[in-house]
Amino acid sequence: TNLFKPMNKKEARAKFMLPEGKKLVLFGSLKITDKRKGVDYLIEACKLLAEKHPEWKESLGVVVFGNQSQQLQEQLPFHVYPLPYIKNEHEIVNIYNAVDLFTIPSLEENLPNMIMEAMACGVPCVGFNVGGIPEMIDHLHNGYVAQYKSSEDFANGIHWILTEPEYDE
């Protein structure tokens, strides 16, 4: 059987003590601070979203998994739920199923497994138009392909998924 598949969101959130009433955005990387992973663009996109949608400050959270995940707590305008780097595939499946969207602001990527895994779990993705990402994300269908290095368009992608009726629970 395929390990990566949609599961009960409430149960998945309970496993990581994540809140039920919030929309949760996921960002994960072995090393969060690696500039190639584009975390600065995610931070900037979140700041833009918080300015445009101040009401989201209470209703949106960011789940970050990876080494140095705690470092983002001070830099993001939304509540951050830091998790360590997770190698166990069953736990990774639960993380995908606990969130509302997966962000991959990488500045260089081939065919990122994390997009395939998230999508197999039914989670829409936002990524930049770089490497294999545009071949994996069907723009405005199962995710959003943002203009390369545009924090503003990345924010548009997060906003689109969070407000698209198809993805609203």
Protein language model regions, located:
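Nucleotide-activated donor-binding/catalytic signature segment of Leloir-type glycosyltransferases, i.e.
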Residues: 53, 57-61, 66-90
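Short acidic/histidine- and often glycine-rich active-site loop of Leloir-type glycosyltransferases
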Residues: 116, 130-140, 144-145
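A short helix/loop element that forms part of the nucleotide-sugar donor recognition site in Leloir-type
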Residues: 5-18
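Conserved donor-binding/catalytic core segment of Leloir-type glycosyltransferases
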Residues: 19-37, 43-47
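Short hydrophobic beta-strand element within catalytic cores of glycosyltransferases
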Residues: 124-127
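Aromatic "clamp/platform" in nucleotide-sugar-dependent glycosyltransferases that forms part
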Residues: 107
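Conserved acidic donor-binding segment of nucleotide-sugar-dependent glycosyltransferases
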Residues: 139-140, 144-151, 160-165
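Short alpha-helical donor nucleotide-sugar binding micro-motif in glycosyltransferases
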Residues: 94-99
